Amino acid sequence: MFFEILLAASIAVVADTYAVYPALVAALGVVRPREWRKDDSHTPQLTLLVSAYNEQDVIEAKLQNCLALDYPRERLQILVASESTDGTNEIVARYAARGIELQAFHVRRGKSATIARVLPDARGDIIVFSDANAMYRWDALR
């Protein structure tokens, strides 16, 4: 008799966890939907730091990707750290009017050293690191 009660209690706990509780939450969501407000007043300042080395083939797509991100422009600093010797710096410089900042270095010291040199200029409360060939979904920063 004890084992039958224990088995029934175990089945009830599992059923509650995987069936009853999710059904109640879904029903509550239908009955009392939450009003969704997009409030950017508490959105932190964010720096998107893109490191680039001879990325002229992909840098323009990366910059377009950065500008298309769903994050308030006044709260987003896009900073490109480049040690490039190809046309990457010239492409990035064309985006200066759109708020993209370029820090170009002529001596190659490697990715870690370049990031370390640029970090003091990052104004964000949060810093997101990215390679030039990594494309983000539009909502990746939220």
Annotate each language-model stretch with its function:
Residues 127:
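Short aromatic/hydrophobic "clamp" motif used to bind/position activated sugar donors
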Residues 60, 87-90, 130-142:
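Acidic donor-binding/catalytic loop of UDP-sugar-dependent glycosyltransferases
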Residues 65, 72, 81-90, 107, ...:
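A conserved acidic beta->alpha catalytic loop
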Residues 23-33, 55-68:
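Short, well-formed alpha-helical segments that are part of the catalytic scaffolds
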Residues 1-40:
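N-terminal membrane-anchoring/stem segments of glycan-assembly enzymes
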Residues 44-47, 77:
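Cell-envelope/extracellular polymer assembly enzymes that use nucleotide-activated donors
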Residues 105-122:
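Glycine-rich, basic loop-to-helix element that forms the pyrophosphate-binding segment
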Residues 76, 99-101:
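Short, conserved active-site loop motifs that form the nucleotide-linked donor/cofactor pocket
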